[in-house]
């Protein structure tokens, strides 16, 4: 009888390790994807090297101006372009619109533009393409010296430009919200400071006062002194005389009676009652003081 061997399944220890490796690879791929997304979201610091290597693209108009008849490059000359190259510039200058002529001030400063300008100037200096405008000095006459200003009178605009740049840099920084707790603390501190100031002012007033000299001395002087002032336009008082009795005559049996004024007698304009006079005087005194 042939011996039949039983085939048993062997457990592979490598299966678990392979699963772990697959999981770790998936995690690593996810991390790399997230890092790439984060790098794309980031703003590039400074000027990119690719932009410096590529350089600026020269427009066709500049090539036409430099070599309109294609003497350097060769080829057919396009007469239509030569005729129409100046018309576009004239039409753009004539068409002045409010939307294009005025621009809103953003009060922000682009640092990359300044960096590019600095790099271009340095490259021109190294290549020797710098325009020596400062070195070209014209010979001065004696009359030109009269129009020159001394250094102490010249107004330097360096401070203004520095302040403008600092303000622009600060305006580009975003503000951070501190939260409600910080606002509440600021309000409490301001209220405490107000209370302290009021208390200090009251204490100063108390210290300055003395028992010998009252604070309302000037007011009391004016109030009491007003009664000693004589009025210039005061109405003239008339002393009223008592009516005289008629003299007795021989044969008069009736009692003497005072003379009566006629009933239709007109009163003078200056004649007033005593109450009205004092009331008007009081009103005038209050107006003065």
Swiss-Prot record:
The keyword Zinc does not apply. One of its GO terms (biological process) is chromosome segregation. Residues 1-12 have a biased composition (Basic residues). Keywords: Centromere, Chromosome, Chromosome partition, mRNA processing, mRNA splicing, Nucleus, Phosphoprotein, RNA-binding, Spliceosome. Residues 1-27, 86-109, 232-289 are annotated as: Disordered. The modification Phosphotyrosine is found at residue 147. The keyword Nucleus applies. The modification Phosphoserine is found at residues 15, 17, 261. Its main location: nucleus. Residues 232-283 have a biased composition (Basic and acidic residues). It is found in: Nucleus; Chromosome, Centromere. One of its GO terms (molecular function) is RNA binding. GO terms for cellular component: chromosome, centromeric region; spliceosomal complex. It holds the Pfam family Hep_59. The modification Phosphothreonine is found at residue 253. Residues 5-58 are annotated as: Interaction with SNRNP200. Plays a role in pre-mRNA splicing by promoting usage of the upstream 3'-splice site at alternative NAGNAG splice sites; these are sites featuring alternative acceptor motifs separated by only a few nucleotides. May also modulate exon inclusion events. Plays a role in spliceosomal remodeling by displacing WBP4 from SNRNP200 and may act to inhibit SNRNP200 helicase activity. Binds U5 snRNA. Required for proper chromosome segregation. Not required for splicing of shelterin components. PANTHER family: SPLICING FACTOR C9ORF78, TELOMERE LENGTH AND SILENCING PROTEIN 1 TLS1 FAMILY MEMBER. Component of the spliceosome. Interacts with SNRNP200; the interaction is direct. Interacts with PRPF8. Belongs to the TLS1 family. This is Splicing factor C9orf78 homolog. The lineage of its organism: Eukaryota, Metazoa, Chordata, Craniata, Vertebrata.
């Amino acid at each position: 009888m042939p011996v039949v061997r039983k085939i048993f399944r062997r457990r592979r220890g490598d299966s678990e390790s392979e699963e772990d490796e697959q999981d770790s690879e998936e995690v690593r791929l996810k991390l790399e994807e997230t890092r790439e997304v984060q790098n794309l979201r980031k703003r590039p610091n400074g000027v990119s090297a690719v932009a410096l290597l590529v350089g600026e693209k020269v427009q066709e108009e500049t090539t036409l101006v430099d070599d309109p008849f294609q003497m350097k490059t060769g080829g057919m000359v396009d007469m239509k372009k030569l005729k129409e190259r100046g018309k576009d510039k004239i039409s753009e200058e004539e068409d002045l619109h409010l939307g294009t002529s005025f621009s809103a001030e953003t009060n922000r400063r682009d640092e990359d533009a300044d960096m590019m300008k600095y790099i271009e100037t340095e490259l021109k200096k190294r290549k020797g393409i710098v325009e020596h405008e400062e070195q070209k000095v014209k010979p001065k006459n004696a009359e030109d010296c009269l129009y020159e200003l001394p250094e102490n009178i010249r107004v330097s605009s360096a401070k203004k430009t520095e302040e403008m740049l600092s303000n622009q840099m600060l305006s580009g920084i975003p503000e951070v919200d501190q939260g409600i707790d910080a606002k509440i603390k600021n309000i409490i501190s301001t209220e405490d400071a107000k209370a302290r100031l009021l208390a200090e002012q009251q204490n100063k007033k108390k210290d300055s006062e003395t028992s010998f000299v009252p604070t309302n001395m000037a007011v009391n002087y004016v109030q009491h002194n007003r009664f000693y002032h004589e009025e210039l336009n005061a109405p003239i008082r008339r002393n009223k005389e008592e009516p005289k009795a008629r003299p007795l005559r021989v044969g008069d049996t009736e009692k003497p009676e005072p003379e009566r004024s006629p009933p239709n007698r007109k009163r003078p304009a200056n004649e007033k009652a005593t109450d009205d006079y004092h009331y008007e005087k009081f009103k005038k005194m209050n107006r003065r003081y």
